[in-house]
């Protein structure tokens, strides 16, 4: 498949959703970003929340299962404010008052809602950061659905839960539709083993390599 666009979500992603002043600090040269961090930050703050992306509905299902709420964007001058809408209380909450896990997921949810399209490549560094094992499995379930709908995903992880969940979603292919449904999954979550590759890097002197 020919990739259209590639997007990188860094491990230190939550700071960009919690602190809108970080861009102005960068403009004033008070802090230094890597090129990847700068591209990531600008993509979030320049989002058009009125234009729903291809994976918008998937992202809404993901955040509902994850937290029962909704990540929303509010325009404030040049940049976006990220807010959390609590469905039960019908109130908007600042990211600074949210759990670390929700802040970590906010960027991934926003990318799925407004940026990513079929044949794009999404690169996520340590998606499991600050996530309870249950929520790690939920994340992988929706990444698998996005993969089945045409998104390419590359992640780096230290989590056995993430790896095991990918393996579980591959093994779902051996079950009937009814058996899959009883496990609270559906056929959109089933991965073909031919579409998944795992690389284990081993350290050797001054560099790391992937054994053949």
Q: What is each residue range found by the language model?
A:
Residues 1-121, 187-212:
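Phosphate-coordinating catalytic segments in nucleotide- and nucleic-acid-processing enzymes
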Residues 138-212:
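C-terminal lobe/lid and adjacent interdomain/linker elements of RecA-like ASCE P-loop ATPase modules
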Residues 125-127:
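Walker B catalytic acidic pair
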Residues 30, 116-119, 129, 164, ...:
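Short, surface-exposed, charged/polar-biased interaction segments
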């Amino acid at each position: 498949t020919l990739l259209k666009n590639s997007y990188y979500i860094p491990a230190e992603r939550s700071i960009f959703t919690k602190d809108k002043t970080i861009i102005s600090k960068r403009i004033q040269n008070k802090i230094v970003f890597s090129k990847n961090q700068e591209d990531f930050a600008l993509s979030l703050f320049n989002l058009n929340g009125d234009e729903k992306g291809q994976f918008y509905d998937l992202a809404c299902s993901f955040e509902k299962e994850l937290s029962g709420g909704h990540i929303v964007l509010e325009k404030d001058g040049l940049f976006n404010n990220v807010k959390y809408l609590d469905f039960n209380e019908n109130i908007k909450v600042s990211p600074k008052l949210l759990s670390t896990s929700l802040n970590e997921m906010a960027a991934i949810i926003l990318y799925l809602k407004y940026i990513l399209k079929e044949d794009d490549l999404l690169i996520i560094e340590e998606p499991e950061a600050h996530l309870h094992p249950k929520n790690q499995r939920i994340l992988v379930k929706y990444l698998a659905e996005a993969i089945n709908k045409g998104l390419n995903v590359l992640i780096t992880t230290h989590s056995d839960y993430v790896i095991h969940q990918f393996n579980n979603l591959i093994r779902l292919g051996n079950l009937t539709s009814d058996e899959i449904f009883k496990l609270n999954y559906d056929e959109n979550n089933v991965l073909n083993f031919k579409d998944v590759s795992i690389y284990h890097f081993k350290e050797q002197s001054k560099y790391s390599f992937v054994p053949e």
